[in-house]
Amino acid sequence: MNRLDFVDQASLRDDIPVFGPGDTVNVHVKVIEGAKERIQVFKGVVIRRQGGGVRETFTVRKESYGVGVERTFPVHSPNIDHIQVVTRGDVRRAKLYYLRELRGKKAKIKEKR
């Protein structure tokens, strides 16, 4: 193991649940406003997960008042308090970019049995 891998290993979090594209997750994000810090929940469908190690990221998409909102988070970020998996989705793709064009019930993902 080289030096970079050793440094990266120290930065990895071990409290991340197993989740993938199609899963609905609650991401509890630490938000700093002035001197105060609070936790904001971002609930949506994971549309992609990419990278590896410290650089691994995932993108969550949700509809807010008829507008699609996507947010990309680093998996091992200290700004994420915790991730909670709400439902497991049954999808056949690793990247769910096609959900961007779908609205309403068509954008719904079947739940894994």
From Swiss-Prot:
Record-linked Pfam families: Ribosomal_L19 (PF01245)
InterPro entries (UniProt xref): Ribosomal_bL19, Ribosomal_bL19_CS, Ribosomal_bL19_sf, Translation_prot_SH3-like_sf
GO cellular component, one term: cytosolic large ribosomal subunit
Keywords on record: Ribonucleoprotein, Ribosomal protein
Alphabetized GO MF terms: structural constituent of ribosome
GO BP terms, alphabetized: translation
Family to which this protein belongs: Belongs to the bacterial ribosomal protein bL19 family.
Function as written in the Swiss-Prot or TrEMBL entry: This protein is located at the 30S-50S ribosomal subunit interface and may play a role in the structure and function of the aminoacyl-tRNA binding site.
PANTHER family in the record: LARGE RIBOSOMAL SUBUNIT PROTEIN BL19M, RIBOSOMAL PROTEIN L19
HAMAP family assigned to the protein according to its UniProt record, in alphabetical order: Ribosomal_bL19
Descriptive protein name: Large ribosomal subunit protein bL19
